[in-house]
Amino acid sequence: MSKKSNKKLHIICLAAFAVLLCAAIWLLGRVCQPKYMSGVLEGAMTQEYYNEENPHDVIFVGDCEVYENFSPVTMWEEHGITSYIRGSAQQLIWQSYYLLEEVFERESPKVVVYNVQSMKYDTPQSEAYNRMTLDGMPLSKHKLDAIKASMTEDEDMVSYLIPFLRYHSRWSELTDEDFEYAFRRDPVTIAGYLMRADVEPMTKLPTAPVLDDYTIGDTCWEYLDKMQKLCDANGATLVLIKSPSLWPHWYDPVSYTHLTLPTSDLV
């Protein structure tokens, strides 16, 4: 065999090995990545949206205060409004923005509803919550931008793109669920609404804490402005809400001057 043939065979073998290695890493990542099919279901919510086939009149974005407080089924049955909730646990405003960018690539909702609670956070907060929102997004510029904006100091971009690098330590903890749902997921929501059967009445209103700073951070204002411009560019009306909740505390209207968010902007 000539040297030229040997070199060609060597290149083919290296290419085949690289392909097999990449396939193995991808497969192991699918197996080791958390499935969120039991226990904490919130991590499975983001990717459900991509199975939607019909457009929606209204899109909700935000944290648990949207996916636990609004029912798309009720909105349809009582008002004939089609809607979907693109919510996730502790969804930060920049994550809401990039999820909304995805929405406008797929459909043209008339109204976007954003719950402002997460504007209390002006910096990345938690890798665990980041993962529950971002891991379900398909690879795209929107996902890359969302990861970059969301990473805490101890995180890196590569581990989001190659899940096995982050989740390989789960190998000894794998259960039947990890293999059963390696390539599929069961729905955990109804149009993004996470139905709960363990709701309890309020028995005590928490004491409102005294905050060191009542202002909303510049990053939050920046992304709220970008969200408004994105909606305007796509012919959608942006509605800001704050859902009723025990926490964070509802401060008296006279205190809103400290929050720097005009009461006229709240629904």
Task: Describe the predicted segments one by one.
Residues 55-69:
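Catalytic nucleophile-elbow at a beta strand-turn-alpha helix junction centered on a G-D-S/GDSL motif
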Residues 257-263:
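Conserved small/polar residues in nucleotide/adenosyl-binding loops
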Residues 12-30:
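Hydrophobic membrane-insertion alpha-helices, especially the h-region
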Residues 1-8:
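N-terminal Lys/Arg-rich, disordered targeting/topogenic segments
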Residues 129-234:
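Secreted/periplasmic serine-hydrolase-like ester/acetyl group-modifying domain
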Residues 65-144:
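Membrane-embedded segments
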Residues 33-47:
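Alpha-helical transmembrane signal-anchor/signal-peptide segments
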Residues 228-252:
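Active-site segments of SGNH/GDSL-like serine hydrolases
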